[in-house]
Amino acid sequence: MPTSSATPAILPIAAVSQLAFRDAMSGLAAAVNLITTDGPGGRAGFTATAVCSVTDQPPTLLVCINRSASVYDAFIENGTLCVNTLGNGQQDLSNLFGGKSSQQERFAGGQWEAGVTGAPVLDSAKLALDCKVSQSVSVGTHDILFCEVVDIRHQSGADALVYFGRRYHHLPSETPAA
């Protein structure tokens, strides 16, 4: 059977619009997290759903941060962060960290203690993953921070807060038996 060494033509692919992409991403449910840092670059925090596991050897997760965000320099200079996963009833705190309020106002909304890395850990977080940033990769408008987890704190039985369809939703920690 004859073989062809010709390379198939690659047709141009139309770019997806920013609006279409955002609409599509609103269909992905995600945990709501406060990403916090403290150190020489200052104390800072923001709300994020762009967080996910990378590997368990070493335990590593990723966080995406916009390079134009007011908190960007603090995170890069400090090189540490804590992923504080929010529970049901903490929508106001999420909105506070996701809005235009000052860093002082944001942190006044909760009770905090310093984690192993010095990053602020929210006392009432469903889960807190204290991390050191091990690598950063730039893609488009954002940096992807790869973060090695050095300490974990969690509250068993705490209900989760998720964001889906541009709204907050309550996710019970346990499903009652049928």
Swiss-Prot record:
This is FMN reductase (NADH) RutF. Keywords: Flavoprotein, FMN, NAD, Oxidoreductase. It comes from the Bacteria. Gene3D superfamilies: Electron Transport, Fmn-binding Protein, Chain A. It comes from Pseudomonas syringae pv. syringae (strain B728a). It holds the Pfam family Flavin_Reduct. Catalyzes the reduction of FMN to FMNH2 which is used to reduce pyrimidine by RutA via the Rut pathway. The lineage of its organism: Bacteria, Pseudomonadati, Pseudomonadota, Gammaproteobacteria, Pseudomonadales. One of its GO terms (biological process) is nitrogen utilization. Belongs to the non-flavoprotein flavin reductase family. RutF subfamily. One of its GO terms (molecular function) is FMN reductase (NADH) activity. The gene is rutF. Coiled coil: none annotated. It catalyses: FMNH2 + NAD(+) = FMN + NADH + 2 H(+). PANTHER family: FLAVIN REDUCTASE (PTHR30466), FMN REDUCTASE (NADH) RUTF (PTHR30466:SF1). Its EC number is 1.5.1.42. SMART domains: Flavin_Reduct.
